Every structure is written in structure tokens, then in C-alpha cells.
Amino acid sequence: MKNYSKNATYLITVLLFSFVTMLLIIPSKCEAVSNDMQPLEARTADLVQQPRYIIDVPPRCPPGSKFVHKRCRVIVP
């Protein structure tokens, strides 16, 4: 006679592992579907970066020089 308890234990282990795997995978799929069902404006609002306010301040030049054409130039008298 075959050992049916060993086969049953193996079958229960496989079924339990499959059930736990489904419990982990299905919620993530549902979340992805719910994100796709949002209006396009709501999804693109998350993707658009906020504009950065860049203030163009010229660098400080050493004494006796002047900032000309994006560089510090020494003024010759």
C-alpha cells in the first residue's frame, strides 16, 4: 500500500502555498487596476514636477573686476 498521508501532506502544503501566494498577488493587481481607473488629470498631476523658482544671480567677482558675458573680467584702466 502507498503512504497516502505523505501525499496528502504534500498536497495540503502545495495548496496552502498557492493560496498564500494568491493572497499576496491579487491585492497588488487590484491596486494597479484602481490606479488605472483614476481620471487622467489625477494621474498626470502626480507625474508633473512642481516648477522650481530659479533666481539667476551673477556670481560675485573679486574687487577690480566686473561680470561681463557670464564671466568675471578684469577692468584695465
UniProtKB/Swiss-Prot annotation:
**Single GO cellular component term:** extracellular region
- Give each disulfide bond as a residue pair: C61-C72
Q: Tell where it localizes.
A: Secreted
Taxonomically, the superkingdom here is: Eukaryota
Q: Which InterPro entries match?
A: Secapin
Task: Write the record's keywords in alphabetical order, separated by commas.
Answer: Amidation, Antibiotic, Antimicrobial, Disulfide bond, Fungicide, Hemostasis impairing toxin, Immunity, Innate immunity, Protease inhibitor, Secreted, Serine protease inhibitor, Signal, Toxin
- The reply to whether Protein transport figures as a keyword in the UniProt entry is no
Residue positions where Proline amide is found in the record: P77
Q: In which tissues is it expressed?
A: Expressed by the venom gland.
| Any matching Pfam family | Secapin
Signal peptide (residue range)? 1-32
Tell me the GO BP annotations in alphabetical order: defense response to bacterium; defense response to fungus; innate immune response; killing of cells of another organism; venom-mediated perturbation of sensory perception of pain in another organism
Q: Which residues form the propeptide?
A: 33-52
Molecular function terms, GO-annotated:
serine-type endopeptidase inhibitor activity
What exactly does this protein do?
A: Serine protease inhibitor which exhibits antifibrinolytic, antielastolytic and antimicrobial activities. Displays antimicrobial activity against bacteria and fungi. Likely functions in the innate immune response to microbial infection and possibly in the venom, as an antifibrinolytic agent. Induces hyperalgesia and edema mediated by leukotrienes when injected into mice. Does not induce hemolytic activity, mast cell degranulation, or chemotactic activity for polymorphonucleated leukocytes (PMNL).
Question: What family is this?
Answer: Belongs to the secapin family.
What protein name does the entry list? Secapin-2
Q: What organism, scientifically named, is this protein from?
A: Apis mellifera (Honeybee)
What lineage does UniProt assign to this protein's organism? Eukaryota, Metazoa, Ecdysozoa, Arthropoda, Hexapoda
